[in-house]
């Protein structure tokens, strides 16, 4: 699973997801891609599940690029803990995804295989996505 090798600060504020993605919203390496339609946190486990689904369906053919990286730590407190005594410890990593963000890219496979692979990966995501094609 993806996670940063080292970070400057162990804990972060949760923040909020306003607006649409202005960066990472164009296909740059592959030919087909799923594009986010809603804002959400996507965990490193979900990213890995989607990557596995695409690579299994596409078999040996083609190449996959993961365009999002989980760089935000999410903290959780232990169950049945009293209030106070500081912020909880980091439990998992998420990627903050806004609408229009490209999640993965696929190249080197026919359109029908890419579309089916992306649909399987989209089921593993907590958001709605759309299938887009690079038109030159």
Swiss-Prot record:
PANTHER family according to UniProt: 50S/60S RIBOSOMAL PROTEIN L16 (PTHR12220), LARGE RIBOSOMAL SUBUNIT PROTEIN UL16M (PTHR12220:SF13)
Subcellular location(s) per record: Plastid, Chloroplast
GO molecular function terms attached to this record: rRNA binding; structural constituent of ribosome
Protein name: Large ribosomal subunit protein uL16c
Disulfide bonds: none
Claim: Nuclease is one of the keywords in the record: no
Region (Disordered): 1-25
Subunit structure, interactors included: Part of the 50S ribosomal subunit.
Compositionally biased intervals (Basic residues): 1-17
Coarse class of the protein's main subcellular location: plastid
Annotated family: Belongs to the universal ribosomal protein uL16 family.
Sorted UniProt keywords: Chloroplast, Plastid, Ribonucleoprotein, Ribosomal protein
InterPro entries: Ribosomal_uL16, Ribosomal_uL16_bact-type, Ribosomal_uL16_CS, Ribosomal_uL16_dom, Ribosomal_uL16_sf
GO biological process terms, semicolon-separated: mitochondrial translation
Gene Ontology CC: chloroplast; mitochondrial large ribosomal subunit
A Pfam family hit: Ribosomal_L16
């Amino acid at each position: 699973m993806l996670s940063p090798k080292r970070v400057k600060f162990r804990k972060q504020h949760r923040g909020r997801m306003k607006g649409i993605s202005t960066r990472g919203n164009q296909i740059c390496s592959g030919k087909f891609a799923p594009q986010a339609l809603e804002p959400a946190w996507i965990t490193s486990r979900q990213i890995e599940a989607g990557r596995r689904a695409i690579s299994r369906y596409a078999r040996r053919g083609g190449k996959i690029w993961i365009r999002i990286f989980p760089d935000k730590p999410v903290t959780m407190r232990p169950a049945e803990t009293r209030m106070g005594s500081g912020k909880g410890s980091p439990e998992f990593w998420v990627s903050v995804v806004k609408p229009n963000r490209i999640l993965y890219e696929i190249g080197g496979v026919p359109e029908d295989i890419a579309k089916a692979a992306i649909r399987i990966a989209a089921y593993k995501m907590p958001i709605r996505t759309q299938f887009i094609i690079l038109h030159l």
